[in-house]
């Protein structure tokens, strides 16, 4: 098996994880050359208890004027208490092209660091992304 070829694409938006004493913090990073008008992050999910599923609604966050290279905190996960939860993040990102709507896959315990959108317009692995012009 040959080694994987180096990635020729550049991420525009990605998630970066930073471990602190009490939690794993997750940041949305603007890797473009432009200031984003706004980045809105929405957390959803659920936990099962016996035969019931209980929905989870996290804080909805909105950041304005997110500069190139800047990361904004979108979530924090507790490595012990959050293990039984299934989380999913969605984003609305306003930029010069229009508004991107981005949805991560649902994951148990936390959301992993990952590329959300590449410079060729393709979404990251297991990510849904669509652009609304305007």
Predicted segments, located by residue:
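Beta-strand-rich extracellular modules
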Residues: 92-94
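Acidic, serine/threonine- and proline-rich intrinsically disordered appendage/tail regions
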Residues: 2-8, 98-134
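Exposed beta-strand and adjacent loop surfaces of beta-rich binding modules
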Residues: 23, 36-38, 86
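Short, well-ordered beta-strand segments enriched in hydrophobic/aromatic residues
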Residues: 24-30
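Intrinsically disordered, low-complexity Pro/Gly/Ser/Thr-rich segments with frequent PxxP/GP/PP motifs
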Residues: 48-84, 88, 97
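Short acidic, flexible loop segments centered on an aromatic residue
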Residues: 33-53
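Beta-sheet-dominated interaction scaffolds and their linkers
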Residues: 2-23
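A short beta-strand motif that forms part of the nucleic acid-binding face
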Residues: 43, 78, 104-106
């Amino acid at each position: 098996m040959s080694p994987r070829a180096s990635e020729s694409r550049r991420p525009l938006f990605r998630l970066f994880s930073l471990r602190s004493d009490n939690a794993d913090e997750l940041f949305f990073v603007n890797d473009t050359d432009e200031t984003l008008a706004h980045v809105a992050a929405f957390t959803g999910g659920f936990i099962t208890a016996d035969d019931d599923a209980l929905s989870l609604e996290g804080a909805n966050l909105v950041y304005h004027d997110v500069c190139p290279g800047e990361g904004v905190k979108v979530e924090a996960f507790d490595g012990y208490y959050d293990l039984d939860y299934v989380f999913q993040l969605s984003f609305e990102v306003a930029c010069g092209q229009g508004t991107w709507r981005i949805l991560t896959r649902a994951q148990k315990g936390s959301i992993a660091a990952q590329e959300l959108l590449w410079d060729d317009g393709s979404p990251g692995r297991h990510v849904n992304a669509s652009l609304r012009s305007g």
